[in-house]
Amino acid sequence: MSVNKANSFRSGPDERGRFGIFGGRFVAETLMPLVLELDKAYAAAKADPAFQAEIDFMQRDYVGRPSPLYLAARLTEHFGGAKIYFKRDELNHTGSHKINNCLGQILLARRMGKTRIIAETGAGQHGVATATVCARFGLPCVIYMGTTDIERQKPNVFRMKLLGAEVVPVTSGTGTLKDAMNEALRDWVTNVENTYYLIGTVAGPHPYPAMVRDFQSVIGEETKKQMLEREGRLPDSLVACIGGGSNAMGLFHPFLDDPSVKIYGVEAAGHGLETGEHCASLKGGAPGVLHGNRTYLLQDDDGQIKDGHSISAGLDYPGIGPEHAWLHETGRAEYVSATDREALAAFQLCSKLEGIIPALEPAHALAFVTKIASALPKDHLMVMNMCGRGDKDVFAVADHLGVTL
């Protein structure tokens, strides 16, 4: 469908990196030249067909794209309503969608002549994907990870070390993703000349939110093509989990100007929105500035960032990507939530009915699917982004279910 650019939901951000009132560049003076250099380098790379050709080659031969669009027939039968499809990004090399973005950014870092890579990680999937591309291209890699997340994601910590990365434990705050990102930003300020900060989600100062979205949009572009081949039409709805929101933005963005497609982002409701122990920034937060951009944040009356809670390390972030905040305000996407308990139930159901063990992150998206699927007509086509596999979560889930391993 052709849409006037001025009326398009896909035309952002503006030249200042804003999506409406969200986004922008709120960084220390020391970092501003780096962020501007990155913006310029990314614009040049986008205009160079050789850059995209290199990404396409690596996506095919190294990552294993395109990922399949899979009809979850037994789940569909179980609910007796909507036809449920999974976009199988958990089948990518390294087990999640994170590699899509890491590949694009590592190729950009090399173009810029950077010789050291740093990153933050929560669930460890972005850390593993970053360590993977650094190993592939022979670049040293430092990963910042909160001590709480290190404890609940031990397999991924070992994978990062095996891949040659240095994993730096972060003890400040609650030892989760927000704290890891703070430390990575401190490192970047101190090592401005040679270091590239490979941010893992659609947050941070401009151009990161747009750049990460662009590298992840392969998910939605493939889905659109695959759905037209399979069903001869676009899906009726899209569902994806939201931490910072890169897997969701990757699925949603190519469909934003297709008004017939309903879009649902699923935040982590933790112990319940009413308890205050959750990570649902849009449902329980307010606009503010964190990590270089203006967006919805969990904060107290004084504007101090509150610590969130989620069973899922990858959703345990007190903010959300600025483009999601804008889509929420414009009403183009609907943001809902799922609790720890609901995600655990969906995790088990998917494993038993489809033979697919999902990561706890997409288990939140599936939890929402389970709430609405049965009430939808049988010709309703729903696509859920299965953005990660659950190997990393089996120990944590066993613990929550009271199973001793």
UniProtKB/Swiss-Prot annotation:
This is Tryptophan synthase beta chain. Its EC number is 4.2.1.20. PANTHER family: TRYPTOPHAN SYNTHASE, TRYPTOPHAN SYNTHASE-RELATED. It is an enzyme of class 4 (lyase). Pathway: Amino-acid biosynthesis; L-tryptophan biosynthesis; L-tryptophan from chorismate: step 5/5. One of its GO terms (cellular component) is cytoplasm. It holds the Pfam family PALP. It catalyses: (1S,2R)-1-C-(indol-3-yl)glycerol 3-phosphate + L-serine = D-glyceraldehyde 3-phosphate + L-tryptophan + H2O. Belongs to the TrpB family. Its cofactor is pyridoxal 5'-phosphate. GO terms for molecular function: tryptophan synthase activity. The modification N6-(pyridoxal phosphate)lysine is found at K98. Transmembrane segments: none annotated. The gene is trpB. The beta subunit is responsible for the synthesis of L-tryptophan from indole and L-serine. Tetramer of two alpha and two beta chains. InterPro entries: Trp_synth_b_CS, Trp_synth_beta, Trp_synth_beta/beta-like, TrpB-like_PALP, TrpB-like_PALP_sf.
